[in-house]
């Protein structure tokens, strides 16, 4: 199943909230993303059907291995671009918003090359 940027955002949010809270419910995702609970329910159903997450009997959300892999990939890109943009002098709020857009459209090859170039600059 091909994910849209919004699906990737939900997975990334669940990952971040799991790191912060431990256990995550749909209401936590809705609050964090500032979206309605019905929007989260629809996204959760789509992601569950796609094999990216599960929901237990207590309504806690759990990323599957595939879901975690996607979430970690997006989160890594988000952090990288946010840091790079801030280092280049971009306002943190703008850097965060721009990173959120870039993380979804950049190819794996381009991201890998940028990471390598940034690492070489730090050496």
Task: Report each predicted region and the residues it spans.
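Residue-level signal for threonine
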Residues: 4, 63-64, 107
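Canonical helix-turn-helix DNA-binding module
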Residues: 26-57
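Clustered cysteine/histidine zinc-coordinating segments, centered on FYVE zinc fingers that bind PI3P
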Residues: 84-86
């Amino acid at each position: 199943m091909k994910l849209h940027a919004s699906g990737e955002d939900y997975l990334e949010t669940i990952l971040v909230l799991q790191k912060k809270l431990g256990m995550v419910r749909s209401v936590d995702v809705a609050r964090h993303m500032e979206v309605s609970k019905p929007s989260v329910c629809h996204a959760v159903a789509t992601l569950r059907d796609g094999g990216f997450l599960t929901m237990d009997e207590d309504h806690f959300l759990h990323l599957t291995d595939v879901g975690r892999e996607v979430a970690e990939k997006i989160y890594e890109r988000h952090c990288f671009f946010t840091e790079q943009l801030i280092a280049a002098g971009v306002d943190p709020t703008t850097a965060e918003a721009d990173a959120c857009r870039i993380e979804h459209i950049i190819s794996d090859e381009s991201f890998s090359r940028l990471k390598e170039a940034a690492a070489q600059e730090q050496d």
